[in-house]
């Protein structure tokens, strides 16, 4: 479904990713681990069309995405939940969610928005309690739920999730990760998860990639093949 092949990418003249190749199949979950500064966020931003690509290719559902802007990639069914959540604080929870449905046609909105909203609040009941509240007054965990819910309103087939546990209380991390598990089981949604918490990656994902200094140092082994020693060794390779 998603194929990243020999990607070199970064920001302007600053190259961050070097010859990165990875694959995500329909309904699969893959994780990307690595130390701070390894290029994990840049990888997701590159797939979403938000970085400069110097070489290589990104294919989604058999279509090349080279040169395609981010909004066009989103319209194909590729959703990005960025690090830091990026919700609109002055808008209500409901308004934030409705913005997430922008790629639907007018007929689809009329027919499906109510059902989509129901599915999001079923997944995150706390959002139903805060439906009319401004997003800026939500807790960090509630804002993360809102960011994921907003992405789901576009009916994606692939969702890229960047550091969902960042800055959250343990009970909120458990709720957010539980929701990602539900999405896999109930929606057959393909997920690419960037996360510092190794156990969350191993619990959710079928395969794991490890980045260090912008290069893959461990490429897509199944989670049961990864040992803690192997993960630690990969983190400290020079790349």
Where are these regions (language model features)?
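The feature captures the beta-strand-to-loop junction immediately N-terminal to the Walker
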Residues: 33-35
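Helical segment within the ABC ATPase nucleotide-binding domain
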Residues: 174-187
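ABC-type ATPase nucleotide-binding domains, specifically the catalytic core motifs of the NBD
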Residues: 12, 68, 93-112, 123-125, ...
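Conserved ABC transporter NBD signature motif
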Residues: 56-64, 76, 112-117, 218
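ABC ATPase C-loop
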Residues: 151-152
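Helix-to-loop junction immediately C-terminal to a conserved catalytic motif
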Residues: 48
């Amino acid at each position: 479904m998603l194929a990243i092949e020999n990607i070199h990418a970064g920001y302007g003249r600053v190259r961050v990713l070097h010859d990165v190749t990875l694959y995500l199949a329909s309904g699969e979950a893959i994780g990307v681990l690595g130390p701070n500064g390894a290029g994990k966020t840049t990888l997701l931003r590159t797939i979403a069309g938000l970085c400069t690509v110097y070489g290589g290719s990104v294919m989604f559902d058999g279509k090349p995405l080279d040169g395609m802007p981010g909004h066009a990639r989103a319209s194909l069914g590729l959703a990005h939940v960025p690090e830091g959540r990026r919700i609109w604080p002055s808008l209500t929870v409901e308004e934030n969610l409705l913005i997430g449905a922008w790629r639907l046609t007018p007929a689809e909105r009329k027919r499906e928005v109510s059902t989509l909203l129901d599915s999001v609040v079923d997944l995150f009941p706390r959002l139903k309690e805060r439906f009319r509240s401004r997003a800026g007054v939500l807790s960090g965990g509630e804002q993360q739920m809102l960011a994921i819910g907003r992405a789901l309103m576009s009916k994606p087939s692939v969702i890229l999730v960047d550091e969902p546990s960042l800055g959250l209380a343990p009970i909120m991390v458990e709720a957010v990760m539980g929701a990602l598990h539900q999405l896999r089981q109930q929606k057959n949604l393909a997920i690419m998860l960037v996360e510092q918490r190794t156990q969350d990656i191993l619990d959710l994902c079928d395969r794991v990639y490890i980045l260090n200094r912008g290069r893959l140092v461990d490429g897509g082994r199944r989670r049961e093949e990864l040992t803690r020693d192997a993960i630690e060794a990969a983190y400290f390779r020079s790349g």
